[in-house]
Amino acid sequence: MYHDYASKLLADYRSDPPLWESDLPRHNRYSDNILNSRYCGNKNGAAPVYNEYTNSPEKAEKGLQLSDLRNFSFMLNPQHKNIGYGDAQDLEPYSSIPKNKLFNHFKNHRPAFSTHTENLIRRNVVRTEKKTFPQVASLKGTQKNCLTQPSSLPSLKNPKNSSVPSTRFSEHTKFFSYEDIPKLKTKGTIKHEQHLGDQMPGQHYNGYIPHKDVYNILCLAHNLPASVEKGIAGRGIPLGNPHVKPNIEQELIKSTSTYTGVPMLGPLPPKDSQHGREYQEFSANRHMLQVANILHSVFANHSIKPQILEDIPVLNAQLTSIKPVSPFLNKAYQTHYMENIVTLVPRFKSIANYSSPIPNYSKRNSGQAEYFDTSKQTISRHNNYIPKYTGGIGDSKLDSTFPKDFNASSVPLTSAEKDHSLRGDNSACCISSISPSL
């Protein structure tokens, strides 16, 4: 079905790739072809919307219309076509978007992926009429109202009862409350087949996916509500920030655990210990323990082929580069942490030294949170939060049981993974495998 649908979309492709896709390799122009051949009026090989050589200079200057953008709004959300292009109320129904600003416009209002990750995901997403890239909405709200109680979270076991929107947030998005977004509540469930690692034979990705993108990918996998995503990534509600009430942090982690089915790690420290550097360090480490459990649940307990994960080395880098050395982490926490890491590490092939970025919270724009650029700002400049640790596989500081010549190819596959490998179908292993009920 995947190949048939792709062939149908690509049949009438006649134009050069659009500006925002020009950095992708020419052997896989799937997204370009969708945008040009079907959703931008170029169905029958006619001149593309971007044609600068048209006889109508006015048309050339005008570029894409918002009405054209709505034609492929399924990339954001097919049910709410006015959401995802910034504040919908600020745009006239058919206001033009100059083509030279189109790329920046989308970059600011789509999921906060880095260019590398966005290209990776855009290249490997199967888009059909009922599948969606979760939309980014700029909505009004306040920090105090952004909690989601566990009882309101949909259950993975019964996804048909899901009524919580899959809203994506960029760094530029303000806090929100569910009262602000009644239009975004969806009925039923949206199936997702985001292929995170399918690629051409022999092709490898250099570098790694930035820290925050791992959480975005994780939330894509589970279709998590935005407030739960904030709990996972430690973003909207800053986990470990001494200025945030501890019960908010506890509720967010509880919501995350309830939604993903991952057990809680235990109670927070006493209230008299929930301030200052020690608590920040404890909370940050505790948060990574919880994330390790969630990633373990998503990637290690489901039939995702190791070769898929090899293309996302940052997951390995993140989990193996953080060592719980805080004096507030007792032996039970460390044991639980290492069990998850040891289970996950064999799924990966390579390791990169990595330091985790942390949020930089600013009062600008009434509660908006700013975040360090992964490539520029790292934890090494803020050692009072998490001890910097750049060890990896084979590093005795991490775990003395790992051989220095460790090779992931020697790890035996599970029966489900063997089945996928025998089929030789890259597209067979996708995020929808995480929850067969979807």
Swiss-Prot record:
Disulfide pairs here are none
Q: Where in the cell is it found?
A: Virion
Give the main localization category.
virion
Per the record, its GO cellular-component terms are: virion component
User: Would you say which domain of life the source belongs to?
Assistant: Viruses
Q: Where is this region: Disordered?
A: 145-167
* Keyword annotations: Late protein, Virion
What triggers production of this protein?
Expressed in the late phase of the viral replicative cycle.
The record's function comment reads: Together with the penton and the other minor capsid proteins (M1249L, p17), forms a complicated network immediately below the outer capsid shell, stabilizing the whole capsid. Plays an essential role in the formation of infectious virus particles. Especially required for the formation of the capsid vertices. During virion assembly, associates with the membrane and probably mediates the docking of the penton complex to the inner membrane, where it recruits the capsomers to form the penton core.
What the record says about family reads: Belongs to the asfivirus p49 structural protein family.
- Give the protein name, as stated in the record: Minor capsid protein p49
> What is the species of this protein?
African swine fever virus (strain Badajoz 1971 Vero-adapted)
User: What are the leading ranks of the lineage?
Assistant: Viruses, Varidnaviria, Bamfordvirae, Nucleocytoviricota, Pokkesviricetes
